């Protein structure tokens, strides 16, 4: 199982900026902890961070056929990017949107997430632990989709055998 972890603008400044909102862990520390949890569960992670909308769109599109799911923190682009929302919709795979802070307790302009409409689910307000929650959710969704596909294939094979 492979999951892309895509981080949006200013998340490279975690641990430095607004610690009262985002905590004191750096993005690298969050990734290290997430990597450890993934390895314990046999999951491969690919990490990506960009401050540029087009690069995030490109990375989402590159996920098609190469990963089983996406965990994304679009950061400020959550509230503005139809392009990222459209890219997430286009790849048609499990997507978990993660926000470190509770966007619903923040300024009004931060309380609407455009990208959430293309996400399977949203985790908001649990700090860095939200990424672990996202990993667990994605593993469960991906395993369920694989089980459904296997059952469907077994059913088709059984019907084919009956028709012989």
UniProtKB/Swiss-Prot annotation:
Pathway: Metabolic intermediate biosynthesis; chorismate biosynthesis; chorismate from D-erythrose 4-phosphate and phosphoenolpyruvate: step 3/7. Homododecamer. Substrate binds at residues 73, 79, 86, 100-101, 110. NCBIfam families: aroQ, PRK05395.1-2, PRK05395.1-3, PRK05395.1-4. The active site is at residues 22, 99. GO terms for biological process: amino acid biosynthetic process; aromatic amino acid family biosynthetic process; chorismate biosynthetic process; quinate catabolic process. HAMAP family: AroQ. Its EC number is 4.2.1.10. InterPro entries: DHquinase_II, DHquinase_II_CS, DHquinase_II_sf. Belongs to the type-II 3-dehydroquinase family. It catalyses: 3-dehydroquinate = 3-dehydroshikimate + H2O. Catalyzes a trans-dehydration via an enolate intermediate. PROSITE patterns: DEHYDROQUINASE_II. The record marks 17 as: Transition state stabilizer. GO terms for molecular function: 3-dehydroquinate dehydratase activity. Keywords: Amino-acid biosynthesis, Aromatic amino acid biosynthesis, Lyase. Gene3D superfamilies: Dehydroquinase, class II (3.40.50.9100). The gene is aroQ. This is 3-dehydroquinate dehydratase.
